[in-house]
């Protein structure tokens, strides 16, 4: 492209973070929120409206699911962050495997209602086998019947005491406020 100067980054200033988990847990929505908070988007897209940055394929828009891995790069404090939004359904496991190979570390998204399910276990197992650092995000805390404590207990039962919260949801009157 003419007139556009690309910034050069050293390997030390690049982070490749895969976003993994079971289908429908909010991986694409989380990716969209990261892009919005980084200042790349003027508004948040919605999966159900077909307006997210990473679900751009017509089939993804029609089915309201991720089918392909999608790269969402942005800069944060002089570091290039490449978010790799991976599909959550097993029909697209090859894409998940490719995303894991590209990622240096992983965000594993777990629903606050469903808790850890098969996609959670698969992602954790892939991270363990490949030696990748991982962080679990308990997502969808604003949903009815969300239960952070229950999900944390289930995560500890499945994956051991090394799963510890670094941020706690603040609830008031049954509503998420922080």
Task: Describe each PLM feature range.
Residues 3-110, 116, 159, 165:
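P-loop NTPase switch module centered on the Walker A-proximal segment
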Residues 25, 41, 89-90, 113-116, ...:
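Conserved nucleotide-binding/hydrolysis micro-motifs of P-loop NTPases
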